[in-house]
Amino acid sequence: MKLQVLPLSQEAFSAYGDVIETQQRDFFHINNGLVERYHDLALVEILEQDRTLISINRAQPANLPLTIYELERHPLGTQAFIPMKGEVFVVVVALGDDKPDLSTLRAFITNGEQGVNYHRNVWHHPLFAWQRVTDFLTIDRGGSDNCDVESIPEQELCFA
């Protein structure tokens, strides 16, 4: 099956998580007016008694054509990925309880100035780079037992 890749926007992505960006977002000044603070851009949730981790993930580019055959989700915490050098990347997401609901399967491409924060329990494809090795600032939950993986029928990503 073919899955069309769409431009990422907060409106289109809102059921799956948050788009982390400054474009069209409110800010306030701090540090004697030298800094614009774009405050609270994503809902970060960490359940149970684990801690929030800030990491850097170095992702390798995926082979083309890109075929999706599994999704994962994290029931105990959100997961955010922010490219550190302005790279474009692709995300694949779906809703669903015990298994991904393929009627909600969507693919999005960022504009190079966006990150994403997956809500808890949102099915998504594991992180990969789009066109070159990409470093992602990653904010997620430490601890174990927070990753469910499900196979899905193969989906080939299509770029318009």
Swiss-Prot record:
<dbReference type="GO" id="GO:0050385">
    <property type="term" value="F:ureidoglycolate lyase activity"/>
</dbReference>
<dbReference type="GO" id="GO:0006145">
    <property type="term" value="P:purine nucleobase catabolic process"/>
</dbReference>
<dbReference type="Pfam" id="PF04115">
    <property type="entry name" value="Ureidogly_lyase"/>
</dbReference>
<dbReference type="GO" id="GO:0000256">
    <property type="term" value="P:allantoin catabolic process"/>
</dbReference>
<comment type="similarity">
    <text>Belongs to the ureidoglycolate lyase family.</text>
</comment>
<dbReference type="InterPro" id="IPR023525">
    <property type="entry name" value="Ureidogly_lyase_bac"/>
</dbReference>
<dbReference type="GO" id="GO:0004848">
    <property type="term" value="F:ureidoglycolate hydrolase activity"/>
</dbReference>
<dbReference type="InterPro" id="IPR007247">
    <property type="entry name" value="Ureidogly_lyase"/>
</dbReference>
<dbReference type="InterPro" id="IPR024060">
    <property type="entry name" value="Ureidoglycolate_lyase_dom_sf"/>
</dbReference>
<protein>
    <recommendedName>
        <fullName>Ureidoglycolate lyase</fullName>
        <ecNumber>4.3.2.3</ecNumber>
    </recommendedName>
</protein>
<keyword id="KW-0456">Lyase</keyword>
<dbReference type="InterPro" id="IPR047233">
    <property type="entry name" value="UAH_cupin"/>
</dbReference>
<comment type="pathway">
    <text>Nitrogen metabolism; (S)-allantoin degradation.</text>
</comment>
<dbReference type="InterPro" id="IPR011051">
    <property type="entry name" value="RmlC_Cupin_sf"/>
</dbReference>
<comment type="subunit">
    <text>Homodimer.</text>
</comment>
<keyword id="KW-0659">Purine metabolism</keyword>
<comment type="function">
    <text>Catalyzes the catabolism of the allantoin degradation intermediate (S)-ureidoglycolate, generating urea and glyoxylate. Involved in the anaerobic utilization of allantoin as sole nitrogen source. Reinforces the induction of genes involved in the degradation of allantoin and glyoxylate by producing glyoxylate.</text>
</comment>
